[in-house]
A protein has these predicted regions:
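Flexible glycine-rich, low-complexity coil/linker segments exposed to the extracellular/periplasmic environment
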Residues: 1-33, 133-168, 214-263
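Flexible, solvent-exposed coil segments and beta strand-coil junctions
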Residues: 20-31, 66-77, 157-169, 244-254, ...
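Flexible loop and strand-edge segments within Gram-negative outer membrane beta-barrel domains
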Residues: 24-64, 68-72, 82-162, 174-178, ...
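Extracellular loop and loop/strand-boundary signature of outer-membrane beta-barrel proteins
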Residues: 33-36, 76-81, 94, 168-173, ...
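Membrane-embedded beta-strand positions in outer-membrane beta-barrel channels/transporters
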Residues: 47, 90-92, 182-188, 269-271, ...
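Transmembrane beta-strands of outer-membrane beta-barrel proteins
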Residues: 59-61, 105-107, 198-204, 283-287, ...
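Flexible, surface-exposed loop regions and adjacent strand-edge segments
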Residues: 77-82, 122-132, 216-226, 300-307, ...
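Structural signature of Gram-negative outer-membrane beta-barrels, strongest in the C-terminal barrel
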Residues: 98-100, 257-267, 275-348
Length: 348
């Protein structure tokens, strides 16, 4: 409810001077969204593809480069430009070689490089701050003195200051570099010379990923106009005195240690398939062996399994299917490491 007897926080004179824009440092009116964000960003992409081959060998190569710039309205105030800047490089190379009329070897290699530069603060936090920061309590900055950026601010109570969204955005920088290499070698073998409808394939997959990260930051100095240091009768006069609001600012940039992380994934799979029709009888069978190792810490995660399927139908009307899986993981105790999982179904 409104208290009609309460003293207004802002006088009619204050509101008139703010609306007139007579002195944006004494009576600021900040559109924080316009200060922090642009109306548009750029995305650029280039792609080159090459494919060809003959009866024995087929190949495909692709190089894709993309660049995304962010909406942040930043300049190079420090040794960085911390507008969001993302570069992606992707290389794909596929080769298929027909070793014999019944044997095909394939190798697929994918390499990805990603570099991201940004403030060390999320866009979500910046949007939240522009919605919650008052536009009339302090200006974005005051005119620079001695090369120092003089961020505006004010005291909420005691020694607690407001958050200046522009300072929050400008005074930190982070860079992340990621590299991924994924290689798959696959062999397909037709075994019709043993019995018609029998095929086997195997593949080995090795994936490695690495990442490095570091950030830089500088502690900002916050100022406000000292009370009584300006002429109330000449508001267009820019002669005033600033007072420092915090003692923890710095003129020096600090940088974190470079953090590194990586992981490797190894997969091996053998697959034996059989499918054949005898008049109205359709018979199918599959036997699959798979193992996987994922390593990111000292101890790897390992999975191993054998699975199979047997199918039969008569005239595609009477159906039978049997499946089983015998799977294990090192994350369980030795006596519970493997389990058998059968399934049977009938249909008509």
């Amino acid at each position: 409810a409104r208290n009609s007897s309460a003293t207004p926080k802002y006088s009619a004179t204050d509101m008139e001077r703010t609306a007139s824009g007579v002195n944006p440092y004494l009576y600021p009116d900040v559109n924080w969204q316009d200060v922090l964000f642009k109306n548009m960003s750029m995305r650029q992409r280039a792609n080159v593809n090459i494919s060809g081959g003959g009866s024995k060998v087929k190949y495909y190569m692709s190089l894709d480069v993309s660049h995304d710039s962010g909406l942040l309205n930043t300049g190079k105030a420090y040794s960085w430009n911390n507008n969001i800047n993302i570069m992606n490089y992707t290389f794909q190379n596929n080769i298929a070689y027909k070793l014999t009329p019944t044997t095909t070897i394939k190798m697929n290699m994918n390499a990805q490089i990603r570099q991201k530069k940004s403030p060390n603060v999320s866009s979500e936090d910046l949007f939240k701050q522009i919605l919650t920061t008052t536009p009339i309590e302090f200006p974005v900055t005051y005119p620079s003195q001695d090369g120092r950026i003089m961020y505006g601010n004010n005291i909420i109570s005691g020694s607690t200051l407001y958050t200046n969204p522009y300072a929050r955005m400008m005074t930190s920088f982070a860079e992340t570099n990621e590299n991924t290499l994924n290689t798959v070698i696959k062999i397909d073998q037709d075994l019709d010379f043993i019995t018609k409808g029998l095929k086997i394939n195997a593949f080995v997959n090795f994936k490695t990923w690495s990442s490095s990260y570091f950030d830089r930051s500088i502690a900002p100095y916050y100022y406000r106009i000292k009370s009584g240091s300006y002429d109330e009768t000449d508001l267009e006069n820019t002669n005033y005195e600033l007072e420092l609001l915090n003692s923890n600012g710095s003129d020096y940039i600090s940088q974190s240690a470079i953090g590194k992380s990586s992981d490797q994934t190894f997969e091996l799979q053998f697959n034996l398939n059989y499918a054949r029709q005898f008049g109205l009888h359709n018979v199918g069978a599959m036997l699959l062996y798979k193992q996987r190792e994922y390593r990111s810490d000292v101890l790897p995660n390992r999975n191993q399994g054998l699975s199979g399927r047997l199918t039969y139908d008569y005239g595609q009307r009477y159906l039978f299917e049997f499946n089983f899986g015998y799977n294990g993981t090192e994350r369980l105790a030795k006596e519970d490491r493997f389990g058998f999982f059968p399934a049977v179904s009938l249909g008509w």
